[in-house]
Amino acid sequence: MAAVAAEQKKVVVHFRSTGNAPQLKQSKFKIGGNEKFLKIIDFLRRQIHQDTVFLYVNSAFSPNPDELIIDLYNNFGIDGQLVVNYASSMAWG
């Protein structure tokens, strides 16, 4: 039953550029909670037209690409959204 709820739940992902990374015209997107973090990585690579991108949740850590977005949101979501910082080069350890 929890898998069904995760499948139907959309998560608002708020992208924030860091350093010299290009800013997005639209910074908030909805994505299915059952998707893996890899989908966010691939999506952002296409949006900013760069092969190398470093992503961090809440400016703190870089999640494993296999993590489910709903799990990240449930544990680290703030104000109804998952904040993902991105950079062209490594920004945080």
From Swiss-Prot:
GO annotation, cellular component aspect: Atg12-Atg5-Atg16 complex; autophagosome membrane; phagophore assembly site membrane
Subcellular location field: Cytoplasm
Covalent link Glycyl lysine isopeptide (Gly-Lys) (interchain with K-138 in ATG5), residues: 93
Domain of life (superkingdom): Eukaryota
Gene Ontology MF terms: Atg8-family ligase activity
GO biological process: one example: autophagosome assembly
Keywords assigned by UniProt, alphabetized: Autophagy, Cytoplasm, Isopeptide bond, Protein transport, Transport, Ubl conjugation pathway
Pfam families xrefs: APG12
Broad class of the protein's primary localization: cytoplasm
Classification via PANTHER family: AUTOPHAGY PROTEIN 12 (PTHR13385), UBIQUITIN-LIKE PROTEIN ATG12 (PTHR13385:SF3)
Membership in a protein family: Belongs to the ATG12 family.
Main function: Ubiquitin-like protein involved in cytoplasm to vacuole transport (Cvt) and autophagy vesicles formation. Conjugation with ATG5 through a ubiquitin-like conjugating system is essential for its function. ATG12/ATG5 conjugate has an essential role in plant nutrient recycling.
Protein name in the entry: Ubiquitin-like protein ATG12
Organism: Oryza sativa subsp. indica (Rice)
Gene designation per UniProt: ATG12
